[in-house]
């Protein structure tokens, strides 16, 4: 879909459809009031007859309104005016896109970006409208033989901004929104791909394609099992040794900083393309969803795509830690003791706590880049789902300023995170009689002890950990990858690049 911004009066629009808001109870927004005045009270008369209350989710399509040049006016319920927050705003945009597609309108001028949203400026409203529109229109039908296509899909959306001074900000919002939405789509496509197709080799092929697309400043290197053995990445290798698919670590290097020697931001993504649990096998119920255990790697891939598309003036390294945890005669066992790349030893008490074993060696590997910061993203623990549910990502960090940056980016983007503690009391739960540490610390504080485990491999740099086990995908009828936290990390990078236009 094509997006653009303009600043104009509603009565002068000749678009196929004009979109304006209505508040509860039956109150016209300022733009709707202008159209009502021109139409000699036609719209307000409809509201008085009870055609539309103005609740969020309601809509009413009007045809050939008197004295209006546009063929149609779409009235969208926005709820109570004083309660219009960012969550309701996104719901309103989502309803708008669905309603426009149902009407068969191929283009529309949307005045909803002029609504007052608490604490949000025009840039935010336009960018979120773009991201939400793309999210609403997303489908994953690559593997279906019969694809459902709309008769006349919406092709062009124009967002109106209050003044001409805001056109530049609106244009930048569209540019950023499209890049972030493309990153989210890329992450969702990877996450939704079945594990018989999307294995570590597939992740590597996608990483190589990304480098080919943005070859001016992006390269990809793929590290296989032989090189991992030479590096001493025994924990990473142990997880994958029960699989017939080779473990591959894909390293995407993007150099956009005018000074290529500036220390990079490193993003590490857990890429378990399928997690059976290994010898500590998972229950059969919903095991199919363990294809989503690579959503951390998918997130990193999507964020790297966004950064390259916007040519951000940063040096960024994205690592996709691809692997598969399967049951086999060669699989690693509970009771095994592994020597990690760092030299620390780990007693395996549960083979289903495998993500941290892949990550610990990857986090040691990235020391060679002398990073400014390292952020890992992983569907790491069911305990984080219990703690924070499916709406908020868990955040842990060994560096307060980095944690605050990420929390700020989460608020700005609406891709929420919440910080959990990393304290010595939790470290004690990882003690082992036979190795430097165990790979699990018991049920209490399971998300935190997983973070504590990783923290033992990140002492040489500033580090943060995002546990996305609850936010990376949805179950049930709407099953599918969410693309989170691409938006959060994209905002973090935009802030780092000095391109923070969000209030």
From Swiss-Prot:
Its cofactor is Mn(2+). It is found in: Cytoplasm. SUPFAM superfamilies: Macro domain-like (SSF52949), Zn-dependent exopeptidases (SSF53187). The lineage of its organism: Bacteria, Pseudomonadati, Pseudomonadota, Gammaproteobacteria, Enterobacterales. Belongs to the peptidase M17 family. Mn(2+) 1 binds at residues 275, 352, 354. This is Probable cytosol aminopeptidase. InterPro entries: Leucine_aapep/pepB, Macro_dom-like, Peptidase_M17_C, Peptidase_M17_leu_NH2_pept, Peptidase_M17_N. The active site is at 282, 356. GO terms for molecular function: manganese ion binding; metalloaminopeptidase activity. Keywords: Aminopeptidase, Cytoplasm, Hydrolase, Manganese, Metal-binding, Protease. One of its GO terms (cellular component) is cytoplasm. GO terms for biological process: proteolysis. Its EC number is 3.4.11.1, 3.4.11.10. Mn(2+) 2 binds at residues 270, 275, 293, 354. Presumably involved in the processing and regular turnover of intracellular proteins. Catalyzes the removal of unsubstituted N-terminal amino acids from various peptides.
């Amino acid at each position: 879909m094509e997006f653009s911004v303009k600043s104009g009066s509603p009565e002068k629009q000749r678009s196929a459809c004009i979109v304006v808001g209505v508040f509860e109870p039956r109150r016209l927004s300022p733009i709707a009031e202008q159209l009502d005045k021109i139409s000699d009270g036609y719209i307000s008369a409809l509201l008085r007859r009870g055609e539309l209350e103005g609740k969020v989710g309601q809509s009413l399509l009007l045809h050939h309104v008197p004295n209006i040049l546009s063929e149609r006016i779409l009235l969208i319920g926005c709820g109570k005016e004083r309660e219009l927050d960012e969550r309701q705003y996104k719901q309103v945009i989502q309803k708008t896109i669905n309603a426009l597609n149902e009407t068969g309108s191929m283009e529309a001028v949307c005045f909803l970006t002029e609504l007052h949203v608490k604490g949000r400026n025009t840039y935010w409203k336009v960018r979120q409208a773009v991201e939400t529109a793309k999210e609403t229109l997303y489908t994953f039908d690559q593997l279906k033989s019969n694809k459902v296509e709309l008769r006349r899909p919406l092709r062009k959306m124009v967002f109106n901004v209050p003044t001409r001074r805001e056109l530049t900000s609106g244009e930048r919002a569209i540019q950023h929104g499209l890049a972030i939405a493309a990153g989210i789509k890329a992450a969702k496509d990877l996450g939704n791909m079945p594990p018989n197709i999307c294995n570590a080799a597939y992740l590597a092929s996608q990483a190589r394609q990304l480098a080919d697309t943005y070859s001016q400043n992006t390269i990809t290197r793929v590290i296989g099992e032989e090189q991992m053995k030479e590096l001493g990445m025994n924990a990473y290798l142990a997880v994958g040794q029960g699989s017939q698919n080779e473990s591959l670590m894909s390293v995407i290097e993007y150099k956009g900083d005018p000074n290529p020697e500036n220390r990079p931001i490193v993003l590490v993504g857990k890429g378990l393309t399928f997690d059976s649990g290994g010898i500590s096998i998972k229950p059969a119920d919903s095991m199919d969803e363990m294809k989503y255990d690579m959503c951390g790697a998918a997130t990193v891939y999507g964020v790297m795509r966004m950064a390259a598309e916007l040519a951000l003036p940063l040096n960024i390294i994205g690592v996709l830690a691809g692997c598969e945890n399967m049951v086999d005669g060669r699989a690693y066992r509970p009771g095994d003791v592994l020597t990690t790349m760092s030299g620390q030893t780990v007693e395996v008490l549960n083979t289903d706590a495998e993500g941290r074993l892949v990550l610990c060696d990857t986090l040691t590997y990235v020391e060679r880049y002398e990073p400014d910061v390292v952020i890992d993203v992983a569907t790491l623990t069911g305990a984080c789902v219990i703690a924070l549910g499916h709406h908020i990502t868990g955040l842990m960090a060994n560096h307060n300023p980095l944690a605050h940056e990420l929390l700020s980016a989460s608020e700005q983007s609406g891709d929420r995170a919440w910080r959990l503690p990393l304290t010595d009391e939790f470290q004690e739960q990882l003690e082992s009689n036979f190795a430097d540490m165990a790979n699990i610390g018991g049920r209490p504080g399971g998300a935190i002890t997983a973070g504590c485990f990783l923290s033992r491999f990140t002492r040489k740099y500033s580090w943060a950990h995002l546990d996305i086990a609850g936010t990376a995908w949805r179950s049930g009828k709407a099953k599918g990858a969410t693309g989170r936290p691409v938006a959060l990390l994209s905002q973090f990078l935009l802030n780092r690049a000095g391109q923070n236009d969000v209030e």
